[in-house]
Regions:
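A short acidic-to-branched-hydrophobic micro-motif
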Residues: 42-59
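Short, internal acidic amphipathic alpha-helical interface segments
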Residues: 55-104
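Well-ordered alpha/beta subsegment
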Residues: 90-124, 128, 132-145
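Charge-rich, low-complexity N-terminal segments
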Residues: 1-44
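Short, ordered beta-strand-loop transition motifs
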Residues: 23-28, 45-47, 87-96
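Generic recognition of long tandem-repeat/solenoid scaffolds
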Residues: 28-35, 53, 97-101
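Short, highly charged C-terminal tails/helix-capping segments
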Residues: 136-166
Length: 166
C-alpha cells in the first residue's frame, strides 16, 4: 500500500508494523516503541524529513578503540548506521551505546507499507550484527585478560622454580 509521505504518522507506522506482527505501539512523546528481538524506537521527524530507528545497549569498559572498530565494521555493512557513545557512565558503571539508523524521505512523495517493515527488519539485522560484534569484543578482551594473567602466573611460577633450584 502506498502511503503519501504527508499522511505518515507515528500511529500509522505502529499500525503497519502490527499488521506484519511486529509488536509495536506509540508512546506519549510521539515515538513508536518496538519490542522484537531488540527493544527499539522509531521516530518520524517531519521537519527534517526522515525516519530514525534507535536502540541502546549498555557496555562496560568499552574504550574508544573498540568503538572505532565497531563503527568501522558497522559502516561497512551500512553507511547510514551510526553509533553514539555516552561518555558518562550510568549508576551501574556502564556506558550507553546508541545505535541510530536514519532513512531519508526528502526525495520521496510516498512510502510503501512493506518498505517500513523492510526498514525495521534491516535495522534489526544491523542491531544483531552490532550486538554480535560487541560480544566478540568483550570475549576478546576477556581472553586477553586471561592470557595476560596466565602469562603472569607462568612468570611467577618460573621465578619460584629458579628460587627453589638455587
Amino acid at each position: 500500500m502506498r502511503i503519501p509521505k504527508e499522511n505518515l504518522t507515528h500511529g500509522f507506522i505502529a499500525e503497519i508494523l502490527d499488521l506484519f506482527q511486529v509488536n509495536s505501539m506509540t508512546s506519549d512523546n510521539n515515538l513508536v516503541l518496538v519490542r522484537g528481538n531488540y527493544h527499539s524506537t522509531i521516530h518520524l521527524n517531519k521537519d527534517e524529513d526522515f525516519i530514525e530507528f534507535i536502540s541502546t545497549l549498555e557496555v562496560k569498559d568499552f574504550g574508544k578503540i573498540y568503538l572505532s572498530f565497531l563503527e568501522f565494521i558497522m559502516k561497512s555493512h551500512n553507511r547510514d548506521f551510526d553509533i553514539d557513545f555516552d561518555d558518562y557512565p550510568n549508576k551501574n558503571g556502564c556506558n550507553d551505546l546508541t545505535f541510530l539508523f536514519k532513512y531519508d524521505l526528502r526525495n520521496k512523495s510516498h512510502i510503501e507499507d512493506i518498505e517500513i517493515l523492510n526498514l525495521h527488519n534491516l535495522f534489526e539485522s544491523l542491531l544483531y550484527k552490532a550486538n554480535h560484534m560487541c560480544r566478540e569484543i568483550v570475549l576478546i578482551k576477556r581472553e586477553n585478560l586471561i592470557n595476560h594473567k596466565e602469562e603472569k602466573l607462568i612468570k611467577d611460577i618460573n621465578k619460584l622454580e629458579r628460587i627453589y633450584r638455587k
